[in-house]
Amino acid sequence: MAEIIKSVISNVLTAFYQPFWFALLLAALFMLAYKAYPSAKDAARRWVEWFKTDSSFRKIFLLAFYTALILFRTLLNRNIWANPLSDVMGKWWLYTPDGKLTTEMIENFLLFMPFTAILFWCFRDKLLGGWVTFFKTLWCAVKTVFLFSFTIEMLQLVLRLGTWQLSDLFYNILGGAVGGIIYFIAYKIKHIKK
């Protein structure tokens, strides 16, 4: 009987804990919108108007949307781990030592590639300044993705959501660097045509 009660309590607390951070974030954003526009109809009308007319609004919306996808994948929708340091090295190849296929390295690589390109697209002047060079773009991409990814890994460690892994950090940074290179190439092509 004690095991059943323990299991029920554990399952109920886990069911509330898993969506807690997402619910908190969503509630905070809702309250900001509510205080700015108490009328839902007016808020929706203004949002659609901004989306149609303001390109920077669309860019930042895309960045916020993609950042939310990353956070939901890495932090907000994770199970609690008893030992977040159980696999510090992580997975470095497509197959685990027992021969099972894993796509973690590909997911981590692809997760940050668009993020960096979108981030530079939104904040090029603030991040890269007026003169965009290859090494400046690459360094800024690596530095930014390292800080963001390291923060996610540390939050996974502290909050016990997932495992802290060096391979995640490496492939996130590699994906971010490739995203920075893709942004640089697109930027140069766009400015050569002008």
Give short role names for the model-derived ranges.
Residues M1-L161, L166, A177-K194:
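Bulky hydrophobic segments
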